[in-house]
Amino acid sequence: MYIRRTTIRSRQTGQPYYTYRLVESIREGGRVRQRTLLNLGRHFAVPREQWAALVQRMEHLLGGQPDLLPAELDTQWEEAAQRYAAQLIRTRASVQEGRAAEAADYQSVDVDSLELLRPRSVAVEHVALAAVRQVGLDRKLAALGFNGPQQGAAIGTLVARMVAPGSELATHYWLQHHSALGELIDYDFLGLDLMALYRISDQLLKHKGALEGFLYAQERTLFDFEEVITLYDLTNTFCEGTAKVNANAALGKSKEKRSDCPLVTLALVLDASGFPKRSEIFPGNVSEPKTLAQVLGKLTAEHTGNAPTVVLDAGIASEENIAWLVENGYRYLVVSRKRHREFDPDAAVLITQGDALTIRAQRRVNADTGEVELYCHSSQREKKEQGIAELFAKRFEAALEKLAEGLHKKGTVKRYEKVLERLGRLREKYARAAQYYEVSVEQDPASGKTTAITWQRTKPIAETLPGVYCLRTNEADWDEATLWRTYTMLTDLEAVFRSLKSELGLRPIFHRKTDRVSAHLFISVLAYHLVHTIRFQLKAADIHLSWEGVRRELAGQDRVTVTLKRADGKTLHIRKATRAEPRQQVIYDALGLSDRPGRTEKTIA
């Protein structure tokens, strides 16, 4: 074998360029001709003086001598030698795949020569790729004009976000050195340029509307669910650095307590089955109520029948938004913003009862608005509110204690007017707790200084109807249980946001440009489509695992190459997946997948 350089003239520009091939000389009919073994491409980077050593190293690897390293080959090209040797083995193996799988293949080998090479993870990639194909995403990418290499890069980006979320640099390294995904889709990620991942994220964002609409339509067809409920909420995530050139990055109230960083807001619309319908990206300081019409307005024209019922949290359920929903034909179920609470335990209906949670609900019709109001009492929420009230009371008492102790220390506030001013600030800061206390301040008339601060709790700390919250809706025909269970679907949306952030790499954001940040968020949303497709089927099979749990169970199944020296001096190369363990087999069976990802490739060299 040897490497040959050929000059080719571009058909488009007419400019010459070089291409490289790995060839061997063979004799046929008394004549010697060259046969191409591998096309090394035009970006072959190994210098000419290393070609002979590179080919020699490849022959060692093919011949089952991986420990031999030619002295002339620089160590930086060892990875290239292993890559090209693996490609050559796969090329030769494909010729031998026609043999019947049932036929026994006995060969005489030296057991002591056994080597295990190139372990690559495959199980989670196998499941993720099955979801890509199940929803037809690969076909949609082709229909949108993605060519073969672009499809491979797009699928690699999405699967990497599902399996090992990280930056483009981390994704590039994972695809090249840790994953067998390339073997499953017949794509050489070792030849993938890092910038191709950035460009493919731009291309995915360009087709955002088409991809989201296609995926949701496919999911409805696959799982045959009705579009009766729409859940809408927002979350934000933070950017590393200043993000000065990102138009959407702005300081705001961070839901992750990272208000020191620029934020970007993601709005998500889900249906009752948990599948995303649409996503939008807003500045980090956006007013949440003002986003509703912009997002749902794009969905209004798509409804062919009755508009679904929209479920909103209190932060978005402004009077203006409710009026917009009514005007556009939507039914709604929202958390009421009003502070006034009512609840009559005798008139309430028991919704659910257990050791940890009991829910009772009282339904009434508001005579002024005609809305149905559902006052719900949660035993869990009551304990939480009482605990918060006690916590604020302890903090208020600790602040009073500190103020009182300062009267006897040098350099602290003692003047009567200043002490009253400080006390007023404490009452303002701990208003919920201060109402239960009577505080007395004693003054020395001669010096004008405070001599003592005393306090006592005048009544037990008790919130007004603790644990009670109000839902409002124009769904007049729903009973108490239906209303409450529909409202609790918002917790599913909160779970989606947690999954996006903790399992699918939504945070943090390292990009600076607006489009790159938007693409980063959108890729996480696309990955969630695929994750939910998988988990939806697992739940139907009574497997209730988080995505992190699925990844944990599937971890450990790899594709490896086994090499053995034969009696005739040749080397047998076998590449296949390890046998699935019982915990992995359960998941494969639930999804209807083979337990041996990828082909079994056999080569004699």
Predicted regions: what they are:
Residues 45-104:
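N-terminal helical hairpins
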